[in-house]
Amino acid sequence: MICFPLDNTEYEAKDMGAYLGTRTRGVFSAEGNFAVTPAENGLAVKVSPGLAWLKRDLYWGVAVLLESEIMLPLEIADGELERIDVIVCRLDKVANKSEVVVKKGEFSGSPVFAQPQRDDNYDEIYLASVMIQAGATGITKADISSLLLNEDYCGLMRDGVTGIPTEAIQEQATALFNGLYEQLQGRADELEQVLEGIV
């Protein structure tokens, strides 16, 4: 059984991983953290420094720190079809390392990208998607869509067993408000009928 931290006790990586195990996948913030921007020239993007969390397994979380900006080249565009590449922060469980890479999309008239890989080999979050226009020789800001706040692909890390279900809470609050409104409207109609009877 792991108990962390205790005095005079030696620990392994999996023990610290258990400490990080309740943190959700995602980035530290969406403000300049793992920001993806066009390179000055050619088919390439830049990724700013950032801090993120990934999962080795259910009870083993890892922190990933990119300390300095990197540049990622993108493969050549097609002359007629488009594709969407994805900028991925991932844990390579087989090689025992983290990395930021380009996941190349398929050429298509209506391109889409696949879901993040989260299995025995990799754990991934998507930082941004990059539209590679037909015949493109460079990347613009309009070609890049940040995925940092999209919880299907990335999201902000939260410390807890589960994130706060804000959408469900909003739906419950709306249903409660609508129910109260209908009740009050019914009472108002009854009061109006009573007053009409008195007058």
Listing of model-derived features with the role each one plays in the protein:
Residues 5-11, 50-194, 198:
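Beta-strand-rich solenoidal segments
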Residues 1-59, 69:
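N-terminal "first-domain core" detector
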